[in-house]
Amino acid sequence: MELEQLKRQLEQLGERNDSMQQARHRKLLNITRDTGELLSVLVQTRGAQAVLEIGTSNGYSTLWLAEAVRRLEGHVTTIELDEDKRVHAHDNFQRSGLAPWVTLLAGDASELLPTLPQAGYQLIFLDSDRQHYRAWWPQIRRLLAPRGLLVVDNAISHRSEMVEWMNEVGQDPAFATSLVPVGKGEWLVVRL
């Protein structure tokens, strides 16, 4: 299947699914198309060959990342806890033809992040359970390469859920931050 057609299908599926589901864990909570476009541009302009995504869902955002890293001969490692979402993501990676550029890790990010290589990622995309971001920060900080970029989704729409952590990171002299009004708000955190 053509990648653009698959992306459009997943956008429609996500909107339809999320409008019918009440429970948060049953929602796909996909990024917006303009967020996907931004991620693609960020990966390519930074030359990010090693990308980490925390929160795969059905793989829609991963497709944007994988399409970009393919051009750079890079790779995306993505983490998802929910088994049903992993099954859908795996299927979508196969259908897209991008599976060779993606490694899907099954499990809890709290357990998996410590197993990943120090300074191993030029770009990390964080779109998961926001209540854990503060606890994950030491590991994310460890994983981010020099001049690496962390992109945090929902930074405007759900700012109240992570404002303390955002303030903490914003005061760290090793990082510079910017809030970008794309999609539901993307918070960019660059290691200096």
Predicted feature descriptions by range:
Residues 1-123, 130-149, 156-192:
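A short alpha-helical cap/connector motif
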